[in-house]
Amino acid sequence: MLIALYLLSQTIAASGDWAAFDRGATCEAVSRSLLVPLKGDEQPRIAIAFDRGGPRRGEIGLHLHRAARPGSSVVLTVGDQPFLLSARGGDAWSRGPLQEAAIIAAIRRESGMRVEARDEAGRRMVDRYSLSGAPTAIDAAAARCSRKL
């Protein structure tokens, strides 16, 4: 389903391990984790979303390879800087504009990041991401959705 959605999107930039897409009302910088998912697991991915004329100006959304245990913490660590995210099921999000700005600034400085959580069975999950090309994709998505239609 996700792949079909991106096939309908216009690619506006691709650099390193990241790409930027224009999906009409929203533009996103996206990447998938370095993890090759096991059978039954999903491909972890991150999207940094910008709305054209809307409220999202760099919202970070992650999809984990398994659902997080209810009430557990999901921590995104960019370089050595940790960020506590909001989570429900297999998804996690940034907590607001100040945190989003701090995460994006850290992504620009670092070469890698990881997401850690506990799954519903209590097992530790770690998803790792390359940040090669992230600044280019983020800038392209932000610039495209800042244009007036």
Task: Please name every model-derived segment.
Residues 2, 6-149:
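A generic "folded-domain core" signal
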